[in-house]
Design a protein with these regions (language model features):
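N-terminal Sec-pathway targeting helices
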Residues: 1-15
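Feature marks proteins synthesized as precursors that undergo proteolytic processing into two chains
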Residues: 376, 380-381, 459-466
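Ligand/substrate-recognition segments at binding pockets and active sites
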Residues: 401
C-alpha cells in the first residue's frame, strides 16, 4: 500500500510540475447550484451556436432539426443530472445532433495525457542543433503516418509501381488501356513526418543554430514546397507512361490544409475557379477582414505599384469593404431555438471565396505583390498548373472529408474530374484563424464551432456531402472489390468519353 501511495504522490507531483489543473472527479454528486449553472451554460451555448456556428441556420432549414425538442431534452437532462459526467453527456448529445464533424464540445485533455504529450514533444522551446530528425519533427507536431493506398489498387493484376511515399502511384496495365493510379492519404502537412525529416536534415546541413519559432515556420513551408514538388514529379512520371486516365484515391482522407487546393491545380489543365465561402456576421469575421483591408490599403499606397495591379487591388479593396459592410449588418437567428422563423441570413456569402478574395490567379501572376497570398491563398504554394492532362477520376468514400471535399469539389465543379464511389462525409469548411471557441466552465468543456461555410459553384453547401457522378454499390468490407469496381468504372467511362469525342483531323 505504501508503494501505491508513493506512486500516486509522485504522479500528483509530476502533474503539478507540468502545470496541470486540479483534478475534480466527474462523478461527485451534483448540488442544486450545479444544475442551475449547467442550465444557464446551456443558454450560453445555444446563443453562441446561433451567432458563431456557420452551419447553424443551414442545418436547421435543410435537415429540419427540431431545436425546440433538442433544447427541451438537454434542459431536462441537466435539471436532473446526478453529476458532472451526466451533464457533459447532455451537452455532447445536443452538439452531436447537428452531425457536423467540425463542431464539437470537449472536456480538457486528461492531465496524464498532457503530461505524456509534453514528454514526447518536449518543453516547446527552441530545438537544439544536432537533434535527430525524428525527434525534431515530433517536437514540431509531425507524425509518420502510412501513405499506402486507401483501396488496394496495388494488389490488382497488372499493377506496376512507379512511386511510393509520400504519394504512392503506379500503372495498371490493361488489355484495352493502361490506367494510372495515385494516392493522396492526407492534405495535412503534419502527417508527412518523413518529408519533415528530409527538410530537417537539409536545414542541419547548412545551419548550426537552434530552431526557434520562425525556423519552425520556415521548416513547415519547406515541407509544403517539397510535397507540392514531389506530387508534380510523380504526375510527370505518370504522364510519360502514356496512361491517358488517372484515378486519384482520396478514400479515408480526412482533410488537412490549403495543400488540397494546390495539388488540385497540378491535376488540371483547366483553370480552376474557386467557389464562394459564407462568413458569419460576427466580430471574428470582421477582425479577419479588417486585417485584409489594412493590407490592401497599404499596398495601394505604394508609389511603385505597377499600373496593371492597381485596378485589381482597387476592385479587391472594394469587395472587402462591401463584405465588411454586410457583416456589420446584424442577423439574429436565435429565434430558431424557439421554433420561430427568421427572414435574414446568418451568413454573408457573396463577397469572399474559398481562396480569399480572387476566385482565380495564375501561378506567378501576382509575384510582385506582397499581398498575393491574401488575394489568392494557393499562391503561397509553388505549384504548377496542369502537370497532368489526361482524364481524371477521383475515388472517394464516406470518410473523405473537409479539405478533401474542397479538392474534389474544385475539380468536379470546374469540369476537370469525375467523382466515383460514395457520398463524401459532409464536413465542409472548418475554421479560419482558429475558429470561435466558447468556454463552458461549469462543466469544464470547450465548444469549437466552424466559422465558415464553403459553398460549391452550384451554390450548395459542402456540408451536404459530395455526391459521386458514378455511385458504386460496394460491400463495406470488400476492399479489393471496391478497387476493382472503381477501376472498371473509370476505364468504361473514359473509353465511352473518348469514343463520343470528335476525332482530331490528321495532318
Amino acid at each position: 500500500m505504501r508503494a501505491v501511495a508513493r506512486t500516486f504522490l509522485l504522479l500528483v507531483a509530476l502533474l503539478a510540475v507540468a502545470g496541470a489543473a486540479p483534478f475534480v472527479p466527474d462523478f461527485l454528486p451534483a448540488e442544486t447550484s450545479d444544475r442551475t449553472a449547467w442550465r444557464q451554460e446551456l443558454i450560453r451555448l445555444e446563443t453562441h451556436l446561433a451567432s458563431a456556428y456557420a452551419n447553424f441556420q443551414w442545418t436547421v432549414e435543410t435537415d429540419s432539426l427540431d431545436l425546440v425538442a433538442l433544447h427541451r431534452a438537454a434542459d431536462s437532462a441537466l435539471a436532473t443530472a446526478p453529476n458532472r459526467h451526466a451533464a457533459r453527456r447532455a451537452f455532447r448529445e445536443l452538439v452531436d445532433a447537428f452531425e457536423d464533424g467540425h463542431l464539437h464540445v470537449d472536456p480538457p485533455a486528461h492531465p496524464f495525457i498532457r503530461l505524456a504529450e509534453r514528454a514526447v514533444r518536449g518543453s516547446g522551446g527552441p530545438i537544439e542543433a544536432g537533434t535527430s530528425a525524428g525527434s525534431a519533427c515530433r517536437r514540431l507536431g509531425f507524425s509518420a503516418e502510412s501513405h499506402g493506398f486507401g483501396l488496394p489498387f496495388d494488389d490488382l493484376p497488372g499493377y506496376a509501381p512507379m512511386a511510393t511515399a509520400p504519394f504512392r502511384a503506379g500503372i495498371l496495365r490493361g488489355v484495352n488501356e493502361d490506367i494510372a493510379v495515385i494516392r493522396i492519404a492526407s492534405f495535412g502537412e503534419q502527417n508527412f513526418g518523413a518529408v519533415c525529416e528530409e527538410a530537417w536534415r537539409a536545414r542541419e546541413a547548412v545551419s548550426g543554430e537552434p530552431c526557434d519559432e520562425s525556423c519552425a515556420d520556415a521548416l513547415y513551408e519547406d515541407v509544403s514546397r517539397r510535397l507540392v514538388a514531389t506530387f508534380a514529379r510523380t504526375l510527370e512520371q505518370l504522364e510519360r507512361s502514356g496512361a491517358r486516365t488517372l484515378v486519384v484515391d482520396v478514400t479515408g482522407n480526412g482533410g488537412g490544409s490549403g495543400l488540397a487546393d494546390a495539388l488540385a491545380r497540378e491535376l488540371s489543365p483547366v483553370p480552376l475557379r474557386s467557389a464562394p465561402v459564407g462568413l458569419i456576421r460576427h466580430p471574428h469575421s470582421l477582425k479577419a477582414l479588417a486585417g485584409q483591408e489594412s493590407l490592401l490599403t497599404r499596398e495601394l499606397a505604394r508609389t511603385d505599384l505597377p499600373d496593371r495591379h492597381r485596378a485589381l487591388l482597387d476592385s479587391a479593396h472594394a469587395r472587402v469593404t462591401e463584405t465588411i459592410r454586410q457583416l456589420e449588418s446584424p442577423c439574429d437567428v436565435t429565434p430558431l431555438w424557439r421554433g420561430e422563423r427568421v427572414e435574414c441570413r446568418q451568413l454573408v456569402s457573396d463577397g469572399m471565396v474559398s481562396t480569399g478574395i480572387l476566385s482565380y490567379a495564375g501561378p506567378g501572376e501576382l509575384e510582385d505583390l506582397a499581398v498575393a497570398p491574401s488575394l489568392f491563398h494557393p499562391l503561397s504554394y509553388a505549384y504548377r498548373e496542369g502537370v497532368y492532362t489526361g482524364k481524371l477520376y477521383v475515388v472517394m468514400d464516406r470518410a473523405s472529408a473537409s479539405a478533401t471535399e474542397l479538392f474534389a469539389a474544385l475539380l468536379h465543379d470546374n469540369g476537370a474530374a469525375t467523382l466515383v464511389g460514395e457520398r463524401s462525409w459532409g464536413a465542409g469548411c472548418g475554421y479560419t484563424n482558429g475558429g470561435v471557441q466558447l468556454a463552458l466552465p461549469s462543466v469544464a468543456m470547450t465548444l469549437r464551432a466552424p466559422d465558415c461555410a464553403r459553398l460549391r459553384l452550384t451554390g450548395e453547401n459542402e456540408r451536404a456531402g459530395l455526391l459521386p457522378d458514378i455511385p458504386l454499390e460496394w460491400e463495406e468490407q470488400d476492399r479489393a472489390g471496391k478497387a476493382r469496381m472503381a477501376i472498371a468504372a473509370a476505364a468504361t467511362t473514359a473509353r465511352a468519353s473518348r469514343a463520343s469525342s470528335p476525332k482530331r483531323p490528321s495532318r
